[in-house]
């Protein structure tokens, strides 16, 4: 039996021009390409928030995308990450947009 790579979970909130620019759709697409699970949703204060889970290197790739790239029409001012922790199993089976 091979040693499983540690799984990570992290919450995020993205600030800037991230609503009305297909940010959630692009986030969902990118998460599926990278191979992480979790969710994304708009907040009432104009930010986008969510959670990402998966192998550490894939979570790190998604964190980079959420910090620097986003959707083509977005402008990311900053991204806050919180509650980063190692988990024993994934809490989600896919990545979804929440409303």
Curated annotation (Swiss-Prot):
Gene3D superfamilies (alphabetical): 3.30.70.100
Keyword Translocase among UniProt keywords: no
EC number: 3.6.1.7
Occurrences of domain Acylphosphatase-like (ranges): 9-99
Keywords per UniProt: Acetylation, Hydrolase, Phosphoprotein
Matching Pfam families: Acylphosphatase
Modified residues annotated as N-acetylserine in this record: 2
Catalytic activity entry: an acyl phosphate + H2O = a carboxylate + phosphate + H(+)
GO molecular function: acylphosphatase activity
Highest taxon of source: Eukaryota
PROSITE patterns named among the record's database cross-references: ACYLPHOSPHATASE_1 (PS00150), ACYLPHOSPHATASE_2 (PS00151), ACYLPHOSPHATASE_3 (PS51160)
InterPro entries given in the database record: Acylphosphatase, Acylphosphatase-like_dom, Acylphosphatase-like_dom_sf, Acylphosphatase_CS
Keyword Ligase applies: no
Active site: 24, 42
Residues that bear Phosphoserine: 93
Physiological role: Its physiological role is not yet clear.
Family affiliation: Belongs to the acylphosphatase family.
Entry protein name: Acylphosphatase-2
Organism: Sus scrofa
């Amino acid at each position: 039996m091979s040693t499983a790579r540690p799984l990570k979970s992290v919450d995020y909130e993205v600030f800037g021009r991230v609503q009305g620019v297909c940010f959630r759709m692009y986030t969902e697409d990118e998460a599926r390409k990278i191979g992480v699970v979790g969710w994304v949703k708009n907040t009432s204060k104009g930010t986008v928030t969510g959670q990402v889970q998966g192998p550490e290197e894939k979570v790190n790739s998604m964190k980079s995308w959420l910090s620097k790239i986003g959707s083509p029409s977005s402008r990311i001012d900053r991204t806050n990450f919180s509650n980063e922790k190692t988990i024993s199993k994934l809490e989600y089976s896919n990545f979804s947009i929440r409303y």
